[in-house]
């Protein structure tokens, strides 16, 4: 099913100025100005932890969707690194591209992805306060949780004996679609950060790690996440890499100089960029010490 974008936009409030919703065969037809959508993404990125920033917009959309019992839309804006809107609940995913023949932006619904996504097992996560003390609240992915709480995310920088760094390309259905990244994921309920890091690497790129392989080089509070970053020096080559294409669709092995350049690329995962740049000095010291020995 293809949904075409129109340039018709009528609104009475700032929220309504961002997008206009219509019904179409059980899905949602999203009409918007490209610039307005990008404006919303910027606001969400900058003020994500302020729940009231999007309250009126959420209320407006839920009113439109109430009859069909649909309470989640995800749409991607061309050139953007994150979804424009992410309401909690049922998942609908729209891919956006520019159709040169019709000179229009087009959203395509990936039904196979929706079917697979709806079959996924529920994921649960422990939550923490600002000081990383565990609290008595378990978060289910896709549900809301108090703005004062955080969950743990781990990032793992994999370096082989040839001094090459593994960088992957995110599946277009994920947040930050088609962004370059190092292996990154959330720590599940009952896991330690190191256990979560070992699991994420195995699941996403097929490489076996031991917890003792992980050297922590940085941690930071970013939005609603405690981010822990590790580096692992592993004897692997391309024959060891098995991608989970639901998560990542391609990979490359980069030299240190190439990696330093890609970190600043607009399509590099912003979470990875923040934690690596924040901890760059310690990371460089660890790498230098390892290859000097």
Where are these regions (language model features)?
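Conserved active-site alpha-helix within GNAT-family acetyltransferase domains
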Residues: 79-97
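Acidic, metal-coordinating catalytic segment for phosphate/diphosphate chemistry
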Residues: 116-155, 161
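The catalytic Nudix box helix
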Residues: 166-167, 182-215
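Acetyl-CoA-dependent GNAT
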Residues: 3-38
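Nudix hydrolase/Nudix homology domain
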Residues: 178, 216-293
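Conserved acetyl-CoA-binding loop-helix of GNAT-fold acetyltransferases
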Residues: 49-63, 86, 193-196
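Conserved GNAT acetyl-CoA-binding A-motif
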Residues: 36, 66-78
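A short, internal acetyl-CoA/4′-phosphopantetheine-binding micro-motif in the GNAT/acyltransferase core
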Residues: 40-50, 78, 186-189
């Amino acid at each position: 099913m293809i949904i075409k974008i129109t340039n018709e936009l009528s609104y009475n409030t700032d929220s309504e100025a961002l997008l206009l919703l219509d019904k179409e065969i059980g899905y949602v037809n999203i009409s918007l100005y490209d610039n307005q959508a990008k404006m919303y993404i910027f606001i969400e990125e900058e003020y994500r932890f302020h729940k009231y920033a999007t309250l009126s917009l959420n209320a407006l959309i839920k009113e439109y969707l109430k009859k069909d019992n649909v309470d989640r839309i995800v749409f991607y804006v061309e050139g953007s690194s994150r979804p424009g809107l992410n309401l909690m609940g049922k998942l609908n995913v729209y891919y956006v591209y520019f159709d040169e023949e019709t000179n229009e932006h087009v959203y395509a619904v990936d039904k196979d992805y929706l079917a697979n996504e709806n079959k996924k097992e529920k994921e649960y996560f422990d939550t923490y306060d600002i000081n990383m003390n565990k609290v008595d609240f378990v978060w289910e992915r896709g549900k809301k949780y108090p703005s004062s709480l955080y969950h743990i995310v781990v990032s793992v920088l994999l370096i082989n004996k040839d001094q090459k760094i593994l960088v992957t390309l995110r599946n277009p259905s994920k947040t930050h679609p088609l962004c370059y990244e190092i292996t990154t994921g959330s720590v599940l309920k009952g896991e330690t950060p190191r256990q979560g890091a070992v699991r994420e690497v195995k699941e996403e790129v097929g490489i076996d790690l031991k917890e003792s392989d992980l050297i922590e080089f940085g941690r930071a509070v970013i939005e609603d996440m405690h981010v822990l970053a590790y580096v692992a020096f592993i004897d692997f080559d391309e024959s060891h890499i098995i991608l989970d294409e639901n998560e990542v669709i391609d990979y490359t092995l980069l030299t240190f100089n190439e990696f330093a350049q890609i970190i600043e690329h607009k399509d590099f995962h912003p979470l990875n960029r923040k934690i690596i740049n924040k901890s760059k000095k310690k990371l460089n010291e660890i790498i230098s010490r390892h290859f000097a020995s």
